[in-house]
Amino acid sequence: MAQKRLTHLRQLEAESIHIIREVAAEFSNPVMLYSIGKDSSVMLHLARKAFYPGTLPFPLLHVDTGWKFREMYEFRDRTAKAYGCELLVHKNPEGVAMGINPFVHGSAKHTDIMKTEGLKQALNKYGFDAAFGGARRDEEKSRAKERIYSFRDRFHRWDPKNQRPELWHNYNGQINKGESIRVFPLSNWTEQDIWQYIWLENIDIVPLYLAAERPVLERDGMLMMIDDNRIDLQPGEVIKKRMVRFRTLGCWPLTGAVESNAQTLPEIIEEMLVSTTSERQGRVIDRDQAGSMELKKRQGYF
């Protein structure tokens, strides 16, 4: 693919780097949330470009639920070590003590306690006043209307009716003590942009994004990859090897795989060109209307 056909990627890159530098200059204690997925990998790559040849002026934070894919944990530790990043890992101790898990307590309670509450705990613990996230507007309708600088009150809540105007590339980062800003440098990127940029820049990603034979079972209309032995099979369920990959990554019991033969980045890009479904179709946490993304954000979710 010729360089001249990818000029829009360079424009997106420049915008994201500008946002990252603005936050680093404006806030006293920023952090970059690192969820280990493709968007996090692109955001980290952009941050490293923004401050090259220096090191990142802020740490990475992973809010761990204890249920990520094993390959994600391996990739997280390897990446942080390779790039010399300060990596903070937080797991909600109350949730761990209660034994919260997606099979017993369901996706809504698991997400609220281990992700939303865990994130708020970590932000309070370290006193971060700005947190980068890899969310994009094309992912989901509540994210589509959220600003690049997303204001949060002292309880980390988002009010969609209380958003600040963003004229051109001017962002309002004024906050009072206890308040914070969630920052989304990839807001204007699409899933296709992400994959083209990963290919263009040769960015390392978790192998789960590439198709391979993996052990899966069908449950609730989802192809669940069995990553460890913390699952009880229901009557009639059979684990089979199938060619699958993931378009989005999260906790393995709550993230559905898609059947695919795309084993290279060009094949993924080609597959995305004809896809008619959302990348979040496999996320169980998005299926419950009562637990919609906007409601989660109002409660403090990213």
Swiss-Prot record:
> Among the record's GO biological process terms, what is one?
sulfate assimilation
Q: What is its EC number?
A: 2.7.7.4
List residues traversing the bilayer.
Answer: none
Keyword list (alphabetical) reads:
ATP-binding, Nucleotide-binding, Nucleotidyltransferase, Transferase
The pathway this protein participates in, as annotated, is:
Sulfur metabolism; hydrogen sulfide biosynthesis; sulfite from sulfate: step 1/3
Task: Read off the Pfam families from this record.
Answer: PAPS_reduct (PF01507)
Asked if the keyword Cell membrane belongs to this entry, the reply reads no
**By its UniProt entry, which InterPro entries does this protein fall under?**
PAPS_reduct_dom (IPR002500), Rossmann-like_a/b/a_fold (IPR014729), SO4_adenylTrfase_ssu (IPR011784), Sulfate_adenylyltrnsfr_sub2 (IPR050128)
Catalytic EC class: transferase
Keyword Nucleotidyltransferase present in the record's keywords: the answer is: yes
Q: Which reaction does it catalyse?
A: sulfate + ATP + H(+) = adenosine 5'-phosphosulfate + diphosphate
Q: Which Gene3D superfamilies does the record cross-reference, listed alphabetically? A: HUPs
Q: Name one GO molecular function term.
A: ATP binding
Q: Which domain of life is it from?
A: Bacteria
> Which NCBIfam families does this one have?
CysD, PRK05253.1, PRK12563.1
Q: How does it assemble?
A: Heterodimer composed of CysD, the smaller subunit, and CysN.
Q: What does this protein do?
A: With CysN forms the ATP sulfurylase (ATPS) that catalyzes the adenylation of sulfate producing adenosine 5'-phosphosulfate (APS) and diphosphate, the first enzymatic step in sulfur assimilation pathway. APS synthesis involves the formation of a high-energy phosphoric-sulfuric acid anhydride bond driven by GTP hydrolysis by CysN coupled to ATP hydrolysis by CysD.
The similarity annotation says:
Belongs to the PAPS reductase family. CysD subfamily.
Q: Report the protein name in the record.
A: Sulfate adenylyltransferase subunit 2
Gene giving rise to this polypeptide? cysD
